[in-house]
Curated annotation (Swiss-Prot):
Organism: Mus musculus (Mouse)
Biased segments, Polar residues type: 91-105
PANTHER family in the cross-refs: MITOTIC-SPINDLE ORGANIZING PROTEIN 2 (PTHR28578:SF2), MITOTIC-SPINDLE ORGANIZING PROTEIN 2A-RELATED (PTHR28578)
Protein name: Mitotic-spindle organizing protein 2
Phylogenetic classification of the source organism: Eukaryota, Metazoa, Chordata, Craniata, Vertebrata
Annotated positions of the Omega-N-methylarginine modification: R111
Record localization: Cytoplasm, Cytoskeleton, Microtubule organizing center, Centrosome; Cytoplasm, Cytoskeleton, Spindle
């Protein structure tokens, strides 16, 4: 009889709604102490926003960001992991980094994780060591080409 009650309890648990599953998941997280109080709030916000992510993966992401790993590096690594490819093997799919705005930001954040930090460092060094090839400047469509040699306007007439 106890086996039948256990089977019925297991069937009832399998039929539980999404809300009950989420509640059970939260209770399991609190028991395991995977996430702290602030991290739990962030995790619940992420779930409310529709992000379905494993709590352990969420904890790793939060830890990386707490270690000042550049968020762009975390994003690129996640993107490459989801695509099933390494970041270095698919350069045309990676997000372009403008070094003028993010150099000071990434330098301070590269101390973080050894994996993600090295990805950012190698990408930054590679772009710095490449010879710069500048394109010739295109003439402006609104300006007329200079005709006179002096470059000064001769609009005044002498009496």
């Amino acid at each position: 009889m106890a086996a039948a009650a256990a089977a019925a309890g297991g069937a009832a648990l399998a039929v539980s709604t999404g809300l009950e599953t989420a509640t059970l998941q939260k209770l399991a997280l609190r028991r395991k102490k995977v996430l702290g109080a602030e991290e739990m709030e962030l995790y619940e916000l992420a779930q409310a926003a529709g992000a379905a992510i494993d709590p352990d993966v969420f904890k790793i992401l939060v830890d990386l960001l707490n270690l000042n790993v550049a968020p762009l590096a975390v994003f690129q690594m996640l993107k490459s992991m989801c695509a099933g490819q390494r970041l270095a093997s698919d350069p045309q799919d990676s997000v372009p980094i403008s070094l003028s705005t993010s150099t000071s930001e990434t330098r301070g954040r590269n101390r973080g994780g050894p994996i993600l930090g090295n990805v950012t460092i190698s990408a930054e060094r590679g772009s710095r060591e490449r010879p710069i090839q500048r394109m010739p400047r295109q003439p402006s469509a609104t300006r007329l080409p200079k005709v006179g040699g002096s470059g000064k306007s001769n609009s005044r007439s002498s009496p």
